[in-house]
Amino acid sequence: MKTFKFLTALFATAILTACTLDMERPTNVQYIDKTDAIWQQHLQKIQKIQSYQAKGQIGYISPTERFSSRFEWQYQNPKSYTLKLYSLISKSTLLIQMHQSGMTISDNNGNQQSAANAKLLLQEIIGMDVPLEHLAYWLKGQPAMNADYQVGTNHLLGAFTYHVDGSQWTADYLTYHSNNSMPENILLKNDSTKQTLKIRVDEWIY
């Protein structure tokens, strides 16, 4: 257990130089109607993307934990996905794997722990309370059917508000890749738990 916490500390030392996103939500943002034809066409496109990969950089801040790392995300379905974190200052890696029987977290030193409850395992090992099952959709800019969301003037997802386990998450999609209209810089916040997740996606594969 201590080894995992030590690994998290290695990630933490690079937080100041990582993810140049502002921690504060943008203001005075203009939005357009959700019925916009270009947005609806894009929404249909990303809804068809069932499995995909994303690579980039991630920064996480909470009252008790903070770390920054490179990441590789591979998503197949809600019971099959992996998130690999790479330290920016060492060779340390952390692999989070979701499978049929639950979640397994392991590091490059051979330490490993599994549990049926993925949420509790993430909290115990990493100190992170982020709903990865929802992140799969948030990352590609696909709002849930019951989410309160806004469409930007670029005809892409601009922001959303979503309730998970009694707390409220907000997301702001700050920039998109020009070649495929997939998210580039995303700011996720949960004010009730004081968590901030800053994501920069450098590469999309789908």
Curated annotation (Swiss-Prot):
Gene (UniProt): lolB
Organism: Haemophilus influenzae (strain PittEE)
Record family assignment: Belongs to the LolB family.
Cellular localisation: Cell outer membrane
InterPro entries named in the record: LolA/LolB/LppX, OM_lipoprot_LolB
Topology versus the membrane: Lipid-anchor
Annotated Gene Ontology cellular component terms: cell outer membrane
Record has Lipoprotein as a keyword: yes
GO biological process terms held by the UniProt record: lipoprotein localization to outer membrane; protein transport
Matches recorded under Pfam families: LolB
Swiss-Prot/TrEMBL keywords: Cell outer membrane, Chaperone, Lipoprotein, Membrane, Palmitate, Protein transport, Signal, Transport
Signal sequence segment: 1-18
Main location: membrane
Quaternary structure, from the entry: Monomer.
Lipidated positions per record (N-palmitoyl cysteine): 19
Lipid-modified residues, S-diacylglycerol cysteine kind: 19
Function: Plays a critical role in the incorporation of lipoproteins in the outer membrane after they are released by the LolA protein.
Name under which the protein is recorded: Outer-membrane lipoprotein LolB
